[in-house]
Amino acid sequence: MKKTKFFLLGLAALAMTACNKDNEAEPVTEGNATISVVLKTSNPNRAFGNAGDEAKVAKLTVMVYKGEQQEAIKSAENATKVENIKCSAGQRTLVVMANTGGMELAGKTLAEVKALTTELTEGNQEAAGLIMTAEPVEVTLVAGNNYYGYDGSQGGNQISQDTPLEIKRVRARIAFTKIEVTMSQSYANKYNFAPENIYALVAKKKSNLFGASLANNDDAYLTGSLTTFNGAYTPANYTHVDWLGRDFTEPSNNAPQGFYVLESTYAQNAGLRPTILCIKGKLTKHDGTPLSSEEMTAAFNAGWIVANNDPTTYYPVLVNFESNNYTYTGEAVEKGKIVRNHKFDINLTITGPGTNNPENPITESANLNVNCVVAAWKGVVQNVIW
């Protein structure tokens, strides 16, 4: 592994070029201590890509702070530990991040690092390389070798022995794991549904990287739908991105269909902003043939389809939302928010016609049942009846 050292005196400008090296610029090159850090990561689980990718640590970075000033920074590729970080003895703060990409961390103060944010992008829809953070931790380093989270066999000063530092994904995962059309007796001989697309709606655009809650005050949101709905949940600052939409593929536990999203608190700022996972398609006759013009007019007047000559309909699921149509199993998580490092797996049962506006509140008697599992990741299963 190539190692590069940058002497800050007279060469500070060169430090910024080190962000993609295995070993980042180390602000302190002379010291009487080293620290090695080993991590505990969440168990791998099924990814949108290859299994295990969601837990992959492609680049691990450890920063050591003396007060506000960065004393050392070091990275390792494809590793869950960083060893022999040169620093000095005394009270220090450790900050650990993974999969930071091109983020420039060398030389940042502790306050600057804690204030970092991230955005939801097309690049973070890949299972591999999900950004992860651990909350800053206070440690006391002694002269010589220090070890954080090791088993004690190394000797030296053992900190948090046998309890590695836990690092968590900044993103959450929302996905359908089952979609079943079982029309109720009232509709069984009248209607069916032909799915076409899956979208994420009202997805938070930005997130903090550190803090008890990562939901920030920025009121910008993203949608995968090209349609403007102007519903009660529609944000004012709303941007379409095609990568929050996908063609319909039958989901399963082994092949979940969904997206990675950021932490969000639904009642924050301008009003209720629930993150929505939505399936779009066509309302048809019970045998799958197109509706007649009279049937489309009736369905449009009922608010089920978008126009009297267009049978497009939507089945929105408000993820981790409180509703009599929703039941939950798995990890307990407070409703009304998207929480980092959780996967929200949704089992959807369609029992009747959908809606022409997925960004409006749905009545409790709507034809949707949701069962959501939250998992560790932390896992939530949401069962939905429509």
From Swiss-Prot:
GO terms for molecular function: structural molecule activity. GO terms for biological process: cell adhesion. A lipid is attached at residue 19 (S-diacylglycerol cysteine). It comes from the Bacteria. A lipid is attached at residue 19 (N-palmitoyl cysteine). InterPro entries: FimA_C, FimA_N, Fimbrillin. Pfam families: FimA4_C, P_gingi_FimA. Keywords: Cell adhesion, Cell outer membrane, Fimbrium, Lipoprotein, Membrane, Palmitate, Signal, Virulence. It is found in: Fimbrium; Cell outer membrane. Synthesized as palmitoylated lipoprotein precursor. Efficient export to the outer membrane and integration into fimbriae requires lipidation and subsequent proteolytic removal of the lipidated propeptide. The record marks 46-47 as: Cleavage. Structural subunit of the major fimbriae. These long, filamentous pili are attached to the cell surface; they mediate biofilm formation, adhesion onto host cells and onto other bacteria that are part of the oral microbiome. They play an important role in the invasion of periodontal tissues. Fimbriae and their constituents are major virulence factors. FimA proteins from different strains have highly divergent sequences, and this has been used for classification. The sequence-based classification correlates with pathogenicity. Belongs to the bacteroidetes fimbrillin superfamily. FimA/Mfa1 family. This is Major fimbrium subunit FimA type-2. It comes from Porphyromonas gingivalis.
